[in-house]
Amino acid sequence: MEEPQSDPSIEPPLSQETFSDLWKLLPENNVLSPLPSQAVDDLMLSPDDLAQWLTEDPGPDEAPRMSEAAPHMAPTPAAPTPAAPAPAPSWPLSSSVPSQKTYHGSYGFRLGFLHSGTAKSVTCTYSPDLNKMFCQLAKTCPVQLWVDSTPPPGSRVRAMAIYKQSQHMTEVVRRCPHHERCSDSDGLAPPQHLIRVEGNLRVEYSDDRNTFRHSVVVPYEPPEVGSDCTTIHYNYMCNSSCMGGMNRRPILTIITLEDSSGNLLGRNSFEVRVCACPGRDRRTEEENFRKKGEPCHELPPGSTKRALPNNTSSSPQPKKKPLDGEYFTLQIRGRERFEMFRELNEALELKDAQAGKEPAGSRAHSSHLKSKKGQSTSRHKKFMFKTEGPDSD
């Protein structure tokens, strides 16, 4: 094989000879001049200073001395301290729990709801037995305001949501983080507010600085001509089952009537469940409520056995109808009809025997009839059949 010819334009790689040629090209004056001996002595520590520095920790006053002893040493950059983890967001706690007790006041303030069934297509329904509203997310929930006399001018209606259970009452009810980021804002309501008012431009959304609770306020408007009540349309903007929000905890909506100064004129409340199928959930909870409402008989003190239920009904119990033991003779014309009635009688006797409503003698007689397809007699009763031909008349 022929060796490849080297290109004369390519220089050979560096070697010991080329390095010596490059070294001769350097200037005669040394670039790296040694430090003066005095400067080297200044950088060195005496044995006493070294022993003291090893035995004692340098205080804040000794830091300048160390920097003066080594003016040419660059300060070592301190390692960056790791950032502390951000604290987990906690639920805002309220300093007070608003009252949920019904107060009609001097104006007879009370609430009303539209009558609706439990169909699957319903979006909002109210259960009078449970005093609970079932509604879908962001659907219209009409609430009627009834008063006996007109409140003073400037009165307002406030709606606030609180948790029903005592262990959660101090927490502020707000939307879950997912629904807070949704682009469903109407330009008036803050994204964290659960309750909104639909179709009212005079609505105000309040964040109490002391209790941190959210509420929505609208001016009270008297009923229109021909109407007996005022209707406000509310929206609930988060499901009851949302993680990070209500998290399946029941809530109450408190509706208060206030004057222009914020003084209470009336109060009422109802429970709310925001779900996907309000009709189904209402029907289920009402059935469970009726089952729990059935009277349960308590055990007497000191007794470990179940007490027998006491019959408190005054109506007399219907007596069982005694079995008819009388026998009859039936005259049948024609063999075909006779066989049909005989089979019918045997079937009825067998049914009574299986139901346990027939005495032992009848059961024995029915079994005997089943085995013998003709006229039969028993010790206790006797069936008589008379066969008549066509010319018996």
From Swiss-Prot:
Quaternary structure annotation from Swiss-Prot or TrEMBL: Forms homodimers and homotetramers. Binds DNA as a homotetramer. Interacts with AXIN1. Probably part of a complex consisting of TP53, HIPK2 and AXIN1. Interacts with histone acetyltransferases EP300 and methyltransferases HRMT1L2 and CARM1, and recruits them to promoters. Interacts (via C-terminus) with TAF1; when TAF1 is part of the TFIID complex. Interacts with ING4; this interaction may be indirect. Found in a complex with CABLES1 and TP73. Interacts with HIPK1, HIPK2, and TP53INP1. Interacts with WWOX. Interacts with USP7 and SYVN1. Interacts with HSP90AB1.
Sequence positions bearing Symmetric dimethylarginine: R335, R337
Region Transcription activation (acidic), annotated ranges: 1-44
Segments of this protein annotated with the region Interaction with HIPK2: 319-360
Gene from which the chain derives: TP53
Protein name as catalogued: Cellular tumor antigen p53
Sequence motif Bipartite nuclear localization signal, location on chain: 305-321
Region (Interaction with DNA) residue spans: 273-280
